Curated annotation (Swiss-Prot):
PANTHER family recorded: LEUCINE--TRNA LIGASE, MITOCHONDRIAL, LEUCYL-TRNA SYNTHETASE
Family of the protein in this entry: Belongs to the class-I aminoacyl-tRNA synthetase family.
UniProt entry tagged with the keyword Aminoacyl-tRNA synthetase: yes
Pfam families, alphabetized: Anticodon_1, tRNA-synt_1, tRNA-synt_1_2, tRNA-synt_1g
Top-tier EC class: ligase
Protein's name in the database: Leucine--tRNA ligase
Keyword Transmembrane belongs to the record: no
Annotated catalysed reactions: tRNA(Leu) + L-leucine + ATP = L-leucyl-tRNA(Leu) + AMP + diphosphate
Subcellular location: Cytoplasm
Enzyme Commission designation: 6.1.1.4
The organism of origin for this protein: Burkholderia mallei (strain NCTC 10229)
SUPFAM superfamilies named among the record's database cross-references: Anticodon-binding domain of a subclass of class I aminoacyl-tRNA synthetases (SSF47323), Nucleotidylyl transferase (SSF52374), ValRS/IleRS/LeuRS editing domain (SSF50677)
Motif 'KMSKS' region: positions: 624-628
Length: 864
């Protein structure tokens, strides 16, 4: 055993032993309780960041603790390898996305291995490999057969210069990110999945999940179940009588409708724009810019009157029709009723364009004014109808019932349940993704690729140039024969949304070599007992994966309908930011490692200078580590300098897993010092720790009893903290243990060996390398086996027993000292000890005790 702790040597030795033993390969075992813990698989962007380190360490700690407690544990890893960043990198570097992706995977895998993670690499999944995405294609075809997948037109962002479809994030201020051209909205055929078919189940099943309430609320709101009324405004055009249909949750305000707004893509808009150049110009303007709902929600609301009116369904009054840029054809009916008096968006729109505002609900004690919007204007819990004829005085529920009944009687509408959730459009007009297994035949139309011909393999040697989809230019990929009639045909060039890849990978981990999509091993491991990932995935990924599980269940592939029993959303890793701003307002960000910060006498930062030139930089505050703010810390540099165990220890100690973690160089130094102390104690006491003599706990001297009492008391708390995933307090417990062991005077070698062994096991899940090596070189492995599967230490309850206890001593209710008494001391003995204590004499100032209050096991209060 070396005197000095050298992390690189210790970690290399431990990892060598683990590789030789194939230590983390997991197998199904029906006789053991399983625990399947999964970190959300990373995108292979090039190198790990500290968010990855934190996520995977949390997973690893969980795995190791539960394995020591007898669970059959599994921690796999894979790569979410398709996606747009690879195409962008390919364009920038002139290499195929496949080359960039596989190089990144190789480097990031080395980094994970350097962290000492308990990953079963035999189960590695890479989503851009045909043996994985074959099953995306296979399930898509099964869903197509069942009507769960279908084709319809959808709206996309079209760059007219690059002749390509853009993702929402590639549209900047309404222009294409590369060409700068104004982006157009286009309707193109796309494939969708009927996630709406599962809306109620997705909502109801949230109740049974051990997920953060915040995530469940976000999914609940995203699904957005609404109870309302779907009805039509009658109109006549070109000799035909029709209805302009809308859906509303506020039918109680129908008498306040003063306009209707329709989407630019609404069929009525196109008809009304004939021979009206100004109207057509506005429609064209609306079709430019992004199609993201978030963009539309925040942009300026604009509209143009069409000069056409529909009839109010209850009064017959004319209602003017407008085209509004805020109305989405993909939501509801592509038309909305405008009630300016009681909808904030409609209120602003009406004020902007001088439209009538008609109050039709009131709240007692409130006065309505059109001068400015007030929150109560939209209140449906306290409001009653006014200025609404026969509906006056009705509260929300009664008004909706009555109005819906009248609309139904007139054949104009009825109550309806709707969802904010829309079917999942999976078609992407991109190269680097799962090919959609469809063949376009001029005679047979769209023909599914036969199952025996799967996978449709994506060529990996193409290099995107930003002008259209490379697959459409690849004759080798594009040209094929129709499987129905044998005619010359073309392959579908759209690929699948990358959320398809991540919707089920955890099921493939369970059976990575299966010749079917999944097999019996999947039902052994799934659902995941613990899923770990960032809150940013709360909606789309987690919702799609839940939907995918339910589809797989309904197709008879798996027995479960929810992929993850429990979810932990780890907090972000934060760091300081520093910048300089030029005359044009452009900021240049500097990495904290390149900056020297000065502090005031209270330790608060008051200034900073760049090390390279000594000139000031601005303090930008604490923010999430990111490339844009240049405030990241390279995990590889941390591992190279301090070792993986120090990086792991700091990330677990600095904050509870679900909370934000503020980076601290001093904290990293502190973690390193602590591990050196653990090693130093083992080295200094290596001979005493090698003693394996049994001992009678009852016959120990007081020093031994005291040390065992402290260690087992802390162990009890640490075990509890491991179970509730509070790893920061586990590390605190280990620090208390080391302090107690270092400070123990007179404890026998056998007691030191026992208590130091407890410390190593408590620390092991957090810092596996150094504890594994100390366990081995100090002979613990010879007694208990390797630390990988050493049994978790049991709390010796007898050791917690104390002959004496300490009570708080109060005089007239104020704490004046402490009183040691026998554990089984009688009330009389405690009272006698209290009045005989020197602190009582000091503060009683000669006055006799009038009353003595004893709270057993806690305090004694002497009243004078």
């Amino acid at each position: 055993m070396h005197e000095r702790y050298v992390p690189a040597d210790v970690e290399a030795a431990a990892q060598s032993d683990w590789r030789a033993a194939d230590a983390y390969r997991s197998k199904e075992d029906a006789n053991r309780k399983k625990f399947y813990c999964v970190s959300m698989l990373p995108y292979p962007s090039g190198k790990l960041h500290m968010g990855h380190v934190r996520n995977y360490t949390i997973n690893d700690v969980m795995y190791r603790y539960l394995r020591m407690n007898g669970y059959n544990t599994l921690m796999p890893m894979g790569w979410d390898a398709f996606g747009m960043p690879a195409e962008n990198a390919a364009m920038a570097n002139g290499v195929p996305p496949a080359q960039w992706t596989y190089e990144n995977i190789a480097y990031m895998k080395k980094q994970m291995q350097a962290m000492g993670l308990a990953i079963d690499w035999s189960r590695e999944v890479t989503t851009c490999k045909p043996d994985y995405y074959k099953w995306n294609q296979w399930l898509f075809l099964k869903m197509l057969e069942k009507g769960i997948a279908y084709k319809k037109t959808g709206t996309v962002n079209w760059d007219p210069v690059d002749q390509t479809v853009l993702a929402n994030e590639q549209v900047i201020d309404g222009r294409g990110w590369r060409s700068g051209a104004f982006v157009e909205k286009r309707e193109i055929p796309m494939y969708y999945m009927r996630i709406t078919q599962y809306a109620d189940e997705l909502l109801n099943d949230l109740d049974g999940l051990g997920w953060p309430e915040r995530v469940k609320v976000m999914q609940h709101n995203w699904i957005g179940k609404s109870f309302g009324v779907n009805f039509g405004f009658p109109y006549e055009l070109d000799g035909e009588k029709k209805l302009l249909r809308v859906f509303t949750t506020r039918a109680d305000t129908i008498m306040g409708v003063t306009f209707c707004a329709i989407a630019a893509e609404h069929p009525l808009a196109a008809r009304l724009a004939r021979d009206k150049p100004a109207l057509q110009a506005f429609i064209d303007e609306c079709k430019r810019g992004g199609v993201a709902e978030a963009d539309i929600a925040t942009m300026e609301k604009k509209g143009v009157a069409t000069g056409f009116s529909v009839s109010h369904p209850l009064t017959g009054e004319p209602v003017e029709v407008w085209i509004g840029n805020y109305v989405l054809m993909s939501y509801g009916e592509g038309a909305v009723m405008g009630v300016p008096a009681h909808d904030e968006r409609d209120f602003a729109f009406a004020k902007k364009y001088g439209l009538p505002i008609r109050q039709v609900i009131a709240v007692e004690g409130e006065t309505y004014s059109t001068d400015a919007w007030q929150e109560w204007y939209g209140d449906k819990t306290r409001a009653v109808c006014v200025n609404s004829g026969k509906y006056d005085g009705l509260a929300y529920d009664a008004a909706v019932d009555a109005i819906a009944a009248e609309l139904k009687a007139g054949g104009l509408g009825d109550k309806q349940i709707t969802y904010r959730l829309r079917d999942w459009g999976i078609s992407r007009q991109r190269y680097w993704g799962t090919p959609i297994p469809i063949i376009h035949c001029p005679s047979c139309g769209d023909v599914p690729v036969p199952e025996q011909d799967l996978p449709v393999v994506l060529p990996e040697d193409l290099v995107p140039d930003g002008t259209g989809n490379p697959l459409a230019k690849s004759d080798a990929f594009l040209n094929c024969t129709c499987p129905k009639c044998g005619a010359v045909a073309k392959r579908e060039t759209d690929t699948m949304d990358t959320f398809v890849d991540s919707a089920w990978y955890f099921s493939r981990y369970a059976a990575p070599d299966a010749q079917t999509m999944v097999d019996a091993r999947t039902d052994y491991w799934m659902p995941m007992d613990q899923y770990i990932g960032g809150i940013e995935h709360a909606i789309l990924h987690l919702l799609y994966s839940r939907f995918w599980a339910k589809v797989m269940r309904d197709l008879g592939l798996v027995a479960f309908g929810e992929p993850a029993k429990n979810l932990l959303t780890q907090g972000m890793v934060l760091n300081e930011t520093f910048y300089r701003e030029d005359a044009a307002g452009k900021k240049t960000w500097y990495n904290p490692a390149d900056v020297t910060v000065s502090f005031d006498d209270k330790g608060r930062p008051v200034g900073a200078v760049l090390k390279s030139d000594g000139q000031p930089v601005e303090l930008g505050g604490i923010e999430k580590m990111s490339k844009s703010k240049n405030n990241g810390v390279d995990p590889q540099m941390l591992i190279d300098h301090y070792g993986a165990d120090t990086a792991r220890l700091f990330t677990m100690f600095a904050a509870p897993p679900e909370q934000q973690l503020e980076w601290s160089g001093a904290g990293v130094d502190g973690a390193s010092r602590f591990l050196r102390r653990v090693w130093a104690f083992g080295f200094a006491n290596r001979e005493a720790l090698a003693v394996r003599a049994p001992f009678d706990a009852a016959q120990l001297a007081e020093a031994g009893k005291t040390l065992r009492r402290e260690i087992h008391g802390v162990l009890k708390q640490a075990d509890f903290d491991y179970q509730r995933l509070q790893y920061n307090t586990v590390v605190s417990a280990a620090m208390k243990m080391l302090n107690a062991i270092e400070g123990a005077k007179g404890a026998t070698p056998a007691v030191l060996r026992e208590t130091y062994g407890v410390l190593l096991r408590v620390l092991y899940p957090v810092v596996p390398h150094v504890t594994f090596e100390l366990w081995k070189v100090l002979g613990y492995a010879d007694e208990f086996g390797p630390l990988l599967d050493a049994p978790w230490p049991k709390v010796d309850e007898a050791a917690l027993e104390q002959a004496e206890i300490e009570l708080v001593l109060q005089v007239n209710g104020k704490v004046r000292g402490a009183l040691k008494v026998a554990k089984d001391a009688s009330r009389e003995a405690i009272e006698a000890a209290a009045v005989a204590d020197g602190m009582f004499a000091k503060f009683a100032e000669g006055r006799p005790a009038k009353k003595i209050i004893v709270v057993p096991g806690r305090l004694v209060n002497v009243v004078v």
